[in-house]
Amino acid sequence: GLTNVELTAKVRAKEEKIATAIQAYLKEAGITMNVEVIDNGVWTSSRSEGSLQATIVGWFPLYADADNQMYTYYYSENAVGKGVFYNNPEFDALMTEARQTVGDDAKREELYKQADYILSREDYATIPLYYPKLQFVAKPYVKNAKLGNLVYHLYNIDIDLSKK
């Protein structure tokens, strides 16, 4: 097992509670994680410079596809510009092949699963913690507003103001 592992997570104030919870879980595993709350501007410049050993980033994908979640931030040509600094040629090759796979959804899915395994279980470049629950509230006179997995479907809304 690991011994004498220590890391520092520099986080913004809004992530302090999450970082503190992670700190407690890691302590149980024998890993010391120091939590340092820093100003958002300092955090942003530190991330751009690649000087954050560990941090917490909230990100909500634009659409539910593995490509959007992994290629955008972790493909080596994109990673530095996104403040991630990840580079793994095997991961890149899987991403490239998956992006070029057309008409074979099962093969494409398997390639993304392999890439995800490398990213989150071999290299630990990212450790997804949770997806926040989306809330949607509408008055009774608003009909056909729907909440999908990741997006609001607002294109077919009916509003009957006479029932207001």
Model regions and ranges:
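Short, well-ordered beta-strand elements
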Residues: 4-12, 33-36, 53
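Early extracytoplasmic/lumenal segment of secretory-pathway proteins
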Residues: 32-45
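Detector for C-terminal structural segments
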Residues: 13-28, 45-164
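Short helix-capping segments at alpha-helix termini
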Residues: 1, 27-31
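Short gly/pro-enriched beta-turn/loop segments at secondary-structure junctions
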Residues: 2-4, 122
